[in-house]
């Protein structure tokens, strides 16, 4: 059993002071809590003999905690006529559920006689003790939080008024003078009368110490019940005390008061708590109450600190007047930090570019190379460490270690190149610095001047010069001697040796210059060096920016990559001129096989395999960066003030890609040369087409047809190559969805040209359907009229399935994955369905109708032209089905398509206007042909020469479509070939005068003549299908007087049948055969 002495040894003055401060703070939060009770207590002491019945409301008890209890008051109801008595406030009780009804309160006066010990001063504690009855025989002592302490020089007995419940047992707490507590046995109190009596309790004063006062309440069995005392000067300890049963003599006074004298029995272990010096701190585990109290204080301070910092963030970011919740403040702060990081990154990149430019300027001024290398190395290392410090995030809490990885990137996954263990802390070699383009051009100019004037000639032939001077000075006689001397010195051997030596020296000089320019002058980045780490960091960030579509940030990161590699974009016109001139010279030299062989077998190239591998790797990385910058420049994502910037980027990419050798894939090499061909076509649209053809052929030779990627396979076709070289296409800087193709990669010019090629194929296919070939060679061919259109559609279907990914591709090259163009596929199905209807093939119409109904999400389905196409296809499908209500449904969809077509003509089209007009012409022709077919089906096979008047709705719709065709013919010349035929048809449907109808049909029967040489005249002439349809209409609906003899009509029908069979119109061919059968039967009957 732990004694009080041991407990006293464990306590320190610091612990006691901390607890006292905490208790005083708790009490200070309720300053006026006990003012009323103290006033009532004072009045109760003055009138002790007055009795007052009180009603006591019992409150719900709360769970007991070891922390400082909060005072709780129970309301006391007093009648107005009674004198107010003092009521003691109840503190936090034990969690014992009371089930008994409210007991009556009885006040008794108990006289306690404690033991005294001599002390200079006496402290008197006035404490009301409240005894509460529970369901069990145990009791709880509730002690108020405020005690009034009085000190007197003389020991005087005082009375303490207490409210005592009528219970089965009572516990009385006494304080010993030496700091210990004696617990008495339960005393039985008998209630004589049912009313409440006032019993004063007389307690003798006792001498205690404030530092060692301990109060402990125990049960009858000796276990402690309550160990917390709300007193700033009292330390509460729990311990098992020895209890001794005492007989309490009870005396009854004359006035009904009960006087009880209770002797106090002291415990066996009665030692005061030792005072520990304040400077001594015992390392011990804090008790439960202290731990929770300290934890609460820490939590409160932590929350206060967090709130203060959040308020400080709000003041910094949004100002002091802004109002926003904590999460909003943190979000704004995060956005502002990201913005500052981007600004710092841009400033660091500009700083790096300026430092590199400063280094190159110093190099040109003739500064010692070794000192420049050392300075640049130290500067780069310091800047790299500073950048790492700025890029690394701060520690999340104060307990986190203050170390960081200088190569960690938050936005990228872990990479072996970014590990600190694998990064070599080695400086760049002197050859890795490279030469500037101005230095290269200066060296080339000096070499050319040296070879032009050739000062070595005078050094190798000094005698010939001296002899010529002597011959001139000594006249004719010396001239003969001179001739003899010249024959002696002018032998072929004397001439050959100096010449060979001269050319050898010149060759060595030229080869040395080439080695300096092409090998040693190239900047080389060492593998796993700090420059390499920084390069890959920015290149990965550029890939992420391209994937997100942030082309400005991607271009900035790519330019930073060039600066890290020792290369930078030209900043002035002089730099651009020098760079472009050097790249043209280098491209010309690399195409010469002898120069490539000499450079490949030179000592500087073969001196070290590791250096060669690093040089080719650096060339490959630089070529990829130049290639991506060139793509951004061509697509308008990298604006430039100079026209030759794109040409310079293209030549840089080509030269470095050829220097990379096997380090670069054939697919990427072909893509680089193809992009250069696009640049040549853009820079020289009408001249120097051989340059475009040269780079295009090199791209095709660099990669075979098997390894050629799908997005570039269309260039292997003759139509694709012809379109690339001779067509007037233009790159679109803004890649948006159109009515005919879906969006390609906005940063890849090859995909943009592929998109233009697909639209060109679709335009040719639809134009061939709407206006077939009218030339004499085409008319003599036995092939189908729509065969050329079917070839175009077949090519379109194949190339639309190999578009390539729409998202931005990484710098490593094109992605092998390919995707189809859903919009191109949809228009392919529409065109195939139209060809099936014109050929009379119902199976083709039914097979493609399901694909037409699946409208792509990327297609603008709200466009009137698209809606007209959809309703036109539905009308054809309803006419083909042949159901009882098929004609009615077909007529309904024809009306819908006609209305949308008229709206599309009123709207100014944006995009490919020629293709829009071709589609509108095709829709007009199909709608008019479909209405003519429906009218002929309703005519119920009339005899030759008879005509049936069409219904008014059908005639109105036909006239509206004919008006659309007339309006389209004003701006589109090929619409004239359809106009005469459909005007004759509407006159037949209206049963108009046959004279004008015959003239219109006669115009449709015209053939191509030798006078129609212009393209406009050819476009206005009708095709073979229109001539055959005009013959059928004339033979079926015109009167017999407008035609020749029956034999001539049979000849015309036979010619129309051959034409329809050649063009592949099965439906019209079947109708023509039926007319020929009827005509032959009628002729036979007339002849008989």
From Swiss-Prot:
Q: Which domain of life is it from?
A: Eukaryota
Q: Which residues lie on this side of the membrane: Cytoplasmic?
A: 1-440, 516-1088
Give the record's GO biological process terms: cholesterol metabolic process; positive regulation of cholesterol storage; positive regulation of transcription by RNA polymerase II; regulation of Notch signaling pathway
Region named Disordered: 59-87, 392-431
- Ranges for domain bHLH come to 290-340
Which segments carry the region annotation Leucine-zipper? 340-361
Feature type site, description Cleavage: 443-444, 481-482
The record's section on SUPFAM superfamilies has:
HLH, helix-loop-helix DNA-binding domain
Which InterPro entries did the record assign? bHLH_dom, HLH_DNA-bd_sf
Instruction: Give start-end positions of Polar residues composition bias.
Output: 59-70
Q: Which keywords does this Swiss-Prot/TrEMBL entry list?
A: Activator, Cholesterol metabolism, Cytoplasmic vesicle, DNA-binding, Endoplasmic reticulum, Golgi apparatus, Lipid metabolism, Membrane, Nucleus, Steroid metabolism, Sterol metabolism, Transcription, Transcription regulation, Transmembrane, Transmembrane helix
MF term (GO), any: RNA polymerase II cis-regulatory region sequence-specific DNA binding
- The residues on the Lumenal side of the membrane are 462-494
Q: Kindly indicate where the leader peptide sits in this chain.
A: none
Membrane spanning segments where?
A: 441-461, 495-515
CDD domains recorded for this chain? bHLHzip_SREBP2 (cd18922)
Looking up PANTHER family in the UniProt record yields: STEROL REGULATORY ELEMENT-BINDING PROTEIN, STEROL REGULATORY ELEMENT-BINDING PROTEIN 2
The name this protein goes by in its record: Sterol regulatory element-binding protein 2
**Species name:** Xenopus laevis (African clawed frog)
């Amino acid at each position: 059993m732990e004694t009080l002495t041991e407990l006293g040894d464990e306590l320190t003055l610091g612990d006691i002071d901390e607890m006292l401060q905490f208790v005083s703070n708790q009490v200070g939060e309720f300053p006026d809590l006990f003012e009323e009770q103290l006033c009532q207590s004072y009045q109760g002491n003055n009138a002790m003999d007055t009795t007052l019945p009180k009603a006591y409301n019992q409150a719900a008890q709360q769970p007991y905690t070891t922390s400082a209890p909060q005072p709780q008051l129970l309301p006391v109801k007093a009648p107005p006529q009674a004198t107010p008595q003092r009521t003691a406030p109840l503190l936090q009780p034990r969690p014992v559920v009371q089930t008994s009804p409210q007991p009556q309160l009885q006040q008794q006066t108990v006289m306690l006689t404690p033991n005294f010990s001599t002390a200079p001063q006496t402290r008197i504690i006035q404490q009301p003790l409240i005894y509460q009855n529970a369901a069990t025989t145990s009791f709880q002592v509730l002690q108020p939080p405020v005690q009034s302490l009085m000190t007197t020089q003389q020991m005087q007995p005082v009375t303490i008024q207490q409210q005592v419940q009528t219970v089965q047992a009572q516990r009385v707490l006494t304080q010993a003078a030496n700091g210990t507590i004696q617990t008495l046995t339960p005393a039985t109190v008998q209630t004589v009368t049912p009313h409440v009596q006032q019993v004063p309790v007389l307690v003798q004063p006792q001498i205690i110490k404030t530092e060692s006062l301990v109060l402990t309440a125990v049960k009858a069995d000796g276990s402690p019940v309550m160990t917390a005392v709300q007193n700033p000067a009292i330390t509460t300890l729990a311990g098992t005390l020895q209890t001794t049963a005492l007989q309490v003599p009870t005396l009854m006074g004359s006035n009904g008061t009960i006087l009880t004298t209770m002797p106090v029995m002291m415990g066996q272990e009665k030692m005061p708590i030792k005072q520990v010096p304040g400077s001594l701190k015992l390392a011990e585990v804090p008790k439960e109450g202290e731990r929770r109290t300290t934890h609460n204080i820490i939590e409160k301070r932590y929350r206060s600190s967090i709130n203060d910092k959040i308020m400080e963030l709000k003041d910094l970011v949004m100002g002091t007047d802004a109002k926003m919740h904590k999460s909003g403040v943190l979000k704004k702060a995060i956005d502002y930090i990201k913005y500052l990081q981007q600004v710092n990154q841009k400033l660091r990149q500009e700083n790096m570019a300026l430092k590199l430019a400063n280094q190159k300027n110093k190099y040109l001024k003739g500064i010692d190379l070794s000192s420049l290398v050392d300075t640049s190395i130290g500067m780069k290392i310091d800047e790299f460490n500073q950048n790492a410090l700025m890029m690394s995030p701060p520690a999340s809490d104060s307990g986190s270690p203050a170390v960081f990885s200088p190569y960690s990137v938050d936005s990228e996954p872990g990479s072996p190149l970014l590990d600190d263990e694998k990064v070599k802390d080695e400086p760049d070699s002197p050859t890795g610095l490279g030469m500037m383009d101005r230095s290269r051009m200066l060296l080339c100019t000096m070499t050319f001047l040296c070879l032009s004037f050739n000062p070595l000639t005078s050094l190798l032939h000094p005698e010939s010069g001296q002899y010529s001077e002597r011959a001139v000075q000594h006249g004719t006689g010396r001239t003969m001697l001179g001739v003899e001397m010249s024959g002696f010195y002018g032998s072929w051997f004397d001439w050959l040796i100096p010449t060979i030596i001269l050319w050898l020296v010149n060759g060595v000089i030229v080869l040395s210059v080439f080695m300096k320019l092409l090998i040693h002058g190239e900047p080389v980045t060492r593998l796993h060096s700090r420059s390499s780490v920084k390069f890959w960091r920015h290149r990965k960030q550029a890939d992420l920016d391209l994937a997100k579509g942030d082309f400005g940030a991607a271009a900035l990161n790519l330019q930073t990559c060039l600066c890290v590699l020792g290369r930078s974009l030209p900043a002035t016109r002089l730099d651009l001129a020098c760079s472009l001139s050097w790249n043209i010279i280098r491209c010309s030299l690399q195409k010469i096989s002898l120069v490539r062989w000499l450079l490949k077998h030179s000592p500087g190239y073969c001196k070290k395999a590791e250096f060669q591998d690093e040089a080719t790797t650096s060339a490959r990385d630089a070529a990829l960066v130049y290639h991506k910058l060139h793509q951004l420049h061509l697509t308008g994502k990298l604006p430039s003030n100079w026209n030759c910037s794109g040409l310079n980027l293209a030549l840089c990419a080509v030269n470095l890609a050829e220097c990379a050798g096997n380090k670069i894939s054939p697919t990427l090499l072909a893509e680089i040369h193809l992009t250069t061909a696009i640049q040549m076509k853009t820079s020289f649209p009408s001249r120097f087409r051989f340059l475009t053809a040269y780079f295009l052929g090199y791209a095709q030779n660099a990669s075979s047809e098997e390894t050629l990627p799908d997005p570039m396979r269309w260039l292997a076709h003759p139509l694709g190559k012809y379109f690339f070289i001779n067509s007037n296409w233009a790159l679109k800087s803004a890649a948006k969805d159109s009515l005919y193709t879906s969006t390609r990669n906005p940063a890849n010019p090859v995909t943009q040209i592929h998109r233009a090629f697909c639209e060109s194929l679709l335009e040719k296919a639809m134009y061939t359907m709407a206006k077939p070939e009218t030339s004499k060679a085409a008319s003599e061919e036995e092939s189908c009229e729509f065969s050329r259109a079917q070839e175009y559609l077949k090519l379109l279907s194949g190339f639309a399935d190999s578009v390539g990914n729409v998202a931005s591709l990484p710098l490593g090259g094109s992605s092998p994955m390919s995707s189809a163009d859903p919009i191109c596929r949809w228009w392919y199905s529409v065109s195939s369905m139209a060809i099936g209807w014109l050929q009379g093939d119902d199976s083709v119409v039914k097979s493609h109708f399901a694909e037409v109904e699946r409208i792509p999400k990327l297609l603008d389905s709200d466009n009137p032209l698209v809606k007209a196409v959809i309703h036109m296809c539905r009308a054809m499908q309803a006419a083909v089905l042949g159901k009882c209500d098929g004609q009615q449904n077909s007529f309904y969809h024809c009306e819908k398509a006609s209305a949308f077509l008229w709206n599309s003509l009123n709207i100014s089209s944006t995009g490919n206007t020629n293709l829009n007009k071709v589609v509108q012409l095709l829709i007009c022709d199909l709608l008019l042909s479909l209405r003519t077919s429906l009218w002929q089906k309703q005519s119920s096979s009339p005899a030759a020469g008879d005509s049936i008047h069409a219904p008014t709705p059908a005639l109105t719709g036909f006239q509206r479509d004919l008006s659309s065709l007339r309006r389209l013919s004003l701006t589109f010349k090929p619409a004239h070939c359809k106009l005469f035929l459909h005007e004759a048809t509407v006159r037949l449907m209206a049963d108009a005068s046959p004279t004008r109808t015959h003239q219109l049909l006669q115009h449709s029967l015209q053939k191509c003549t030798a006078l129609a040489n212009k393209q406009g005249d050819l476009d206005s002439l009708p095709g073979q299908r229109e001539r055959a349809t005009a013959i059928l209409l004339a033979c079926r609906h015109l009167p017999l007087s407008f035609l020749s003899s029956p034999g001539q009509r049979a000849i015309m029908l036979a010619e129309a049948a051959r034409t329809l069979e050649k063009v592949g119109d099965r439906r019209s061919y079947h109708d023509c055969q039926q007319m020929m059968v009827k005509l032959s039967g009628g002729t036979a009957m007339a002849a008989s």
